[in-house]
Amino acid sequence: MTAVRTIGIMTGNSLDGVDIVLTGFENGRITDLDGFSKPYPRSLTEKMLRLRARIREEGGRMERLVEDGFSLEAINEYTSLVAETVNTFLQRSGYCREDIAALGFHGQTCDHFPPSIAGGKPAYTVQVGNAGLLADLTGIPVIYDFRSDDIMAGGEGAPLAPVHNLHIAGDLRNKGVFPVAFCNAGNTGNISVITEDKDGENVVRGWDVGAFNH
């Protein structure tokens, strides 16, 4: 199998910076190769806080904000910072953009209203970010919107970390470390537990456990 390299991009609810990781996939193994972080300028943090508050006031209805110049300005400024982070990383690390198959772009969560708290009302999730602009500014294909399908299927849309932890667990299992549990300590802490079913296949469960890095 030809090695595939991708860059994952995360901006957490703390609104303090952009974190990226370069990950390699080869022969069924996943390896984190390098990473880079860039802090938010204070002005952008303030804009994103205002944007998040407005989206929550509208109950996630983005159509009410599409003609709002401030909202589009904030989203594009945020996306430009993400692109700058990727481009700076590539320049400093020596990796060519042609070596990167795709960017995984989570976007900035501004509201999250899953079934567990919706109380029978329509569930939704809102992550902002201009994927087309990011692709244009970096020259790399962008994969985005990771939570919506799960919400529409009745899931919680969170956490995302168990998917990555499942890959790591496969490598640990080969080394005799299994079953395994992971604690992911972000703005909201979450736990992943990887066990096996009766057929010996890996089974992953994950859930948020509460506020952590506030």
Language-model segment annotations:
Residues 1-214:
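Short acidic/glycine-rich loops and adjacent helix/strand connectors
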